[in-house]
Curated annotation (Swiss-Prot):
Pfam families, alphabetized: SelO
Active-site annotation: D253
Residues that hold Mg(2+) according to the record: N254, D263
EC number(s) from the headed UniProt entry: 2.7.7.-, 2.7.7.108
Cofactor(s) needed: Mg(2+); Mn(2+)
InterPro entries cross-referenced by the UniProt entry: SelO
Binding locations of ATP: G91, G93, R94, K114, D126, G127, R177, R184, D263
Protein name: Protein nucleotidyltransferase YdiU
Name of the gene this protein is made from: ydiU
Coiled coil segments of this chain: none
Keyword ATP-binding attached: yes
Amino acid sequence: MTKNNEAGWNLDHSYTTLPQSFYTEIPPTPVSSPELVKLNHSLAISLGFHPEELKKEAEIAIFAGNALPEGAHPLAQAYAGHQFGHFNMLGDGRALLIGEQITPSGKRFDIQLKGSGPTPYSRRGDGRAALGPMLREYIISEAMYALDIPTTRSLAVVTTGEPTYRETKLPGAILTRVASSHIRVGTFQYAAARGSIEDLQSLADYTIKRHYPEIEAHENRYTALLQEVIKKQASLIAKWQLVGFIHGVMNTDNITISGETIDYGPCAFMDNYDQGTVFSSIDTQGRYAYGNQPYMAAWDLARLAESLIPILHEDEEEALKIAQDEISKFSVQYENQWFLGMKKKLGLFSNEEQDQSLIEQLLKMMEKFKADYTNTFRSLTLNTIENTALFESPEFKEWYKLWQSRLERQEESKENAYEMMKNNNPSIIPRNHRVEEALEAAVTSGDYSVMEKLLEALSNPYAYSADQEDYCAPPAPTNRPYRTFCGT
């Protein structure tokens, strides 16, 4: 481990202790004229960096892949993945892990350059990224962090001064992504597909040491690892559902072992409540629709369990039984987390038998009347029942009476109930049309002020402040259906 004290680099590279089949060492491809367009000050400080130093030319060169900090060990990670149900051997096709930053508190975070050039895993891709998708990842990942949802984060975005060609010519950019690690379900699939039990065991041991050291002494630590990942993903997916987040591409290579949300390509937030909501242009069958996300998470975790079978038990039948037993627990864990979250969204402290029915009735009405998901809960939180089709309906008025009497029956005061609702119902989400507005200004005009204002509003989604009002409105009904596209 080496240290550059001027900017605060303090890099280690524990991933290289794994067998070399898990990665390829390769330097980033330099770019012509990098320019820093966004730096995450608060994240930089928490990682042990000095933000003002990071704005200097020498550090911008690092974010661009034109230079490396002391202790850097750039590598592309190998992994596999089921992409829309089809298995492929994959890997970092346009990203490089330059090292793991050790923070002042001793925590370890991957520092990855996304869009840093081709790698052996690029599969005919150019290894580059466009400015729009990189800024989009910055905005959405920071919004998720503010919503208290586990996520990778964005430290910096630099433009490269070079065009990137997709459907059209676009300005190129590189995002510096920060993650607890980039170990995925697909990393374990890769190890299992190669057929080396020793390599699979090495990966599992490394993952336990890095993410779940408390289970190292467990009688069957590999079963315990599976249990921990299931627990983390059940919690994560419940949090997604509770705020109306739709990931869009829940392939196994986008499911992290740490339980963080990763890959903000075709993601979006739901406006009108609809279980079938899909935004991704490539998800033509609705595989990853809003209502399918819990089921797809269980499917992805079953692929992790399959990969672990060779090390779960020496007897294959027993290993298979262990895997099946553990996967069967996901749905209960998810349902419990989601139900607890929905109760908080409605200010329910105690438990009553009809709570499930109360929640389901509201959601059915919201779907029937195409009610805005975020704003419905926002209105209930503020107790301002606005003139909408949902709130004007006789069935809602009946439901509202039931809900109010339910609040009155619990020991906690209504004031406390509404306060809990305020802490669990965001006033603001990154509305798709407002994100696009910010990206349009930045990419076409070089005007980052629209994005800065949006980021400021999103930084405290539970504030219910006056300056957020402008960002609460859903898109105009005349707007065509929103579609998202994978940045690659």
